């Protein structure tokens, strides 16, 4: 493993453990040259389906895009990086379990919103406002009213 600080190619593993979701191994490493420590994550690379965009284009499933979208929705909210990673891992597992060769962005977006709604309602509304591309304030208010109604039923 190349040291991110000095570029040296040799290090030693100081600590290894599974991540909370059990989908990756977290390793603390120490560079044998500069002695600085850094963390790496190892995860099994699964074959994920092609994503069919709204305009019909196809592209490879990109976990980083989902992480970025969820993290943006969660900015300045009490949601940790670990919670974002766990949410994205759950969506990724759901996509894998479908066993399809292709999946529409709408399926991925709805899976993200379903989980985000239980994690943080403000982040959910932020994500939904971009994902659903509301045409006007009325559509946005309808979504908020639906959220408030569902929230009232759960209490």
Curated annotation (Swiss-Prot):
Keywords, in A-Z order: ATP-binding, DNA-binding, Metal-binding, Nucleotide-binding, Repressor, Transcription, Transcription regulation, Zinc, Zinc-finger
InterPro entries reported in the protein's UniProt record: ATP-cone_dom, NrdR-like_N, RNR_NrdR-like
UniProt entry tagged with the keyword Disulfide bond: no
Claim: Zinc-finger is one of the keywords in the record: yes
GO MF entries: ATP binding; DNA binding; zinc ion binding
The ATP-cone domain, residue ranges: 49-139
UniProt cross-references to HAMAP family, sorted A to Z: NrdR
Name of the protein in its database record: Transcriptional repressor NrdR
Organism name: Anaeromyxobacter sp. (strain K)
């Amino acid at each position: 493993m190349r040291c991110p600080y000095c570029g040296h190619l040799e290090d030693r593993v100081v600590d290894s453990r599974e991540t909370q979701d059990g989908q990756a191994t977290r390793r603390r490493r120490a560079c044998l040259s500069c002695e600085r420590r850094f963390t790496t994550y190892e995860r099994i690379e699964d074959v994920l389906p092609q994503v069919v965009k709204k305009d019909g284009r196809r592209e490879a499933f990109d976990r980083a895009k989902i992480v970025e979208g969820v993290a943006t929705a969660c900015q300045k909210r009490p949601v940790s990086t670990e919670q974002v990673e766990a949410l994205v891992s759950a969506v990724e597992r759901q996509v894998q379990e479908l066993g399809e060769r292709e999946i529409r962005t709408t399926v991925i977006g709805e899976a993200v919103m379903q989980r985000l709604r239980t994690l943080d309602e403000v982040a959910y509304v932020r994500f939904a406002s971009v994902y659903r591309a509301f045409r006007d304030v009325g559509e946005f208010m309808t979504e908020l009213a639906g959220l408030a109604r569902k929230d009232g039923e759960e209490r």
